[in-house]
């Protein structure tokens, strides 16, 4: 396990980026925060971003689908962040069968890749329960607190995890190098911006191999994730490099098999 050193700037930059790109995120909103506080997603978004934005954090100490469903109905939150398994559970929640979810202004999925099929099911579920929003996917890792890109509101591209936050830059490089690849070519996702970590604690070798200065002079976080970026800047996540399977000369990813 690697300890990650994050600064006040890292957390504050994340909060500013999320609030700036989500006009609905305003004082008085309520966020139903299910993600654990020891997780970058839970601390960085469920607590810090919510409080910076003047929102009320409704904390759920331990996930239980029935309790969560009851809170959705009773508290009428405006924002719910979660992971794909949470949304899978909500689809099966009997307590939500006739629930009115028109209170929702933002539904976000992160922490793991959401399949195209599951996203469609969740979107249909939200629409059937009077919500005017779709689930928006994001991508990030603890090395940049949590999310660093997000699907724009009402502008989804199938399979995409969104576009980078303001002041955050993405590039796709040939794995093991700093060579930037052209649009739509698959390689390692690299991130640069104000939310990128300071270092791995007491691990200078790992820090040096992960945070690299490229020819453009910027420090880039090499994520270890495979993906691509199209001509419009939309990012597509494939898989962790270490999970890639090579068979008959082809690169195969578990996520592709699931979809």
Regions found by a protein language model. Name each.
Residues 159-165, 210-211, 217-218:
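Short Gly/Pro-enriched turn/cap motifs at secondary-structure boundaries
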Residues 77-82, 91-158, 169:
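Gly/Ser/Thr-rich phosphate-binding loop
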Residues 80, 193, 198-199, 209, ...:
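AMP-binding/adenylate-forming catalytic core of the ANL superfamily
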Residues 157, 171-190, 213, 229-232:
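Conserved beta-loop-beta connector loops within the AMP-binding
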Residues 12-30, 38-79, 93:
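Conserved AMP-binding/adenylation subdomain of ANL enzymes
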Residues 111, 140, 162, 225, ...:
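Active-site glycine-centered loops adjacent to acidic/histidine catalytic or metal-binding residues
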Residues 66-69, 73, 88, 96-98, ...:
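Short hydrophobic/charged patches on amphipathic alpha-helices used for structural packing
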Residues 1-16, 151:
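Conserved AMP-binding A3 loop
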């Amino acid at each position: 396990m690697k300890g990650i050193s994050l600064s006040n700037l890292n957390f504050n930059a994340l909060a500013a980026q999320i609030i700036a790109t989500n006009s609905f995120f305003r004082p008085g909103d309520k966020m139903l925060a299910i993600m654990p506080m020891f997780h970058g997603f839970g601390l960085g978004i469920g607590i810090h971003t919510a409080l910076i934005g003047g929102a009320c954090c409704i904390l759920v100490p331990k996930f239980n689908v029935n309790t969560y469903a009851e809170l959705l109905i009773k508290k009428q939150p405006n924002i719910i962040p979660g992971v794909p398994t949470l949304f899978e559970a909500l689809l099966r929640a009997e307590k939500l069968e006739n629930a009115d979810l028109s209170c929702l202004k933002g539904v976000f999925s992160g922490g793991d890749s959401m399949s195209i099929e599951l996203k469609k099911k969740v979107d249909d579920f939200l629409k059937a329960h009077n919500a005017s929003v779709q689930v928006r996917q994001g991508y990030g890792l603890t090395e940049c607190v949590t999310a660093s890109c997000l699907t724009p509101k009402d502008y989804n591209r199938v399979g995409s995890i969104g576009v980078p936050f303001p002041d955050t830059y993405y590039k796709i490089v040939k794995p093991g190098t700093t060579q930037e690849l052209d649009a739509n070519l698959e390689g390692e996702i690299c991130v640069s911006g104000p939310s990128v970590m300071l270092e791995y604690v007491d691990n200078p070798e790992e820090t040096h191999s992960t945070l690299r200065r490229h020819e453009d002079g910027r420090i880039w976080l090499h994520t270890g994730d495979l993906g691509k970026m199209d001509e419009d800047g939309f990012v597509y996540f494939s898989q962790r490099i270490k999970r890639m399977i090579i068979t008959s000369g082809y690169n195969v990813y578990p996520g592709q098999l699931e979809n």
